[in-house]
Amino acid sequence: ASDVYKRQDYYSNQISRLIEEFSRLPGIGNKSAQRLAFHVINMPVEQVEGLANAIVDARKNVRYCKECCTLTDKDICPICSNPDRDHKTIMVVETPRDLAAYEKTGKYNGVYHVLHGAISPMLGIGPGDIRLKELMERLQGDVDELIIATNSSLEGETTACLLYTSPSPRD
């Protein structure tokens, strides 16, 4: 246990452990972790078991789509397996959350490629650390348009520049 939790002797070991586990999640600080822990403790046991099972099942069954690299519980995600989508147009996004944001607009009918990150030399994240290789393999197929929709951050712009200046695999 971390020092913060060692000083919280007023919590039982199990509550402290639950708080510590929640605080490991991104964006969850100590106060939020405490709120979540006490909320879970006050939930009916069936709901807690449902939550725990959903987490375990997702971790065991969710994997990368073999085509676009988004997260899915099938070999090929519903978007890539949809024959009504324009498979000749690929939009490159950084995360599955970015994909979901574009899908919510209902305006895009192509398919996606999820990089699962962006290039960040300052953080030691290079082209080999994101799913660029898979994208280059896809571009060897029948693709008419590549839409680069990385984030407007320095890392997203760096990634977009690399994609824009990379030679096409068909050249």
Which role does the model predict for each range below?
Residues 1-8, 164-171:
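Conserved small/polar residues in nucleotide/adenosyl-binding loops
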Residues 9-16, 24, 34-90, 95-99:
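Cys/His-rich Zn2+-binding cysteine-cluster or related metal-binding knuckle/ribbon modules and their
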Residues 33, 82-150:
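Extended interfacial segments that mediate partner engagement and assembly in macromolecular machines
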Residues 48, 124-125, 156-157:
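Alpha-helix N-cap/helix-start motif
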Residues 104-105, 159-161:
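Short amphipathic alpha-helical segments
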Residues 150-160:
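Acidic, metal-coordinating catalytic cores used for nucleic-acid/nucleotide bond scission
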